[in-house]
């Protein structure tokens, strides 16, 4: 069984999307506590804050996405954005690197850490 690689930008976008749904779910739970206004308001506010947090994450990843390096994936020939020393193609999940020292090595997220020495 092979390891499933995923693009960092897509991971962060998926996290932001999940925050939206979690926030809506939490706010919806507040409806079941209509008798107790404090509990209902608390659930609705926490859900609202989760949706606002997702907006902040979407804005942050949008700003980060404008600063990334765009490359053409050698496997699918589509343009993709790369964050860090190693990343995966957004379309075909092919492991990618721009670092000549890492070419031919097994794909590992640890290569992006500052503490890693090649």
Swiss-Prot record:
Belongs to the UPF0295 family. It is a multi-pass membrane protein. One of its GO terms (cellular component) is plasma membrane. It is found in: Cell membrane. The chain crosses the membrane at residues 12-32, 43-63. Keywords: Cell membrane, Membrane, Transmembrane, Transmembrane helix. This is UPF0295 protein BCG9842_B4782.
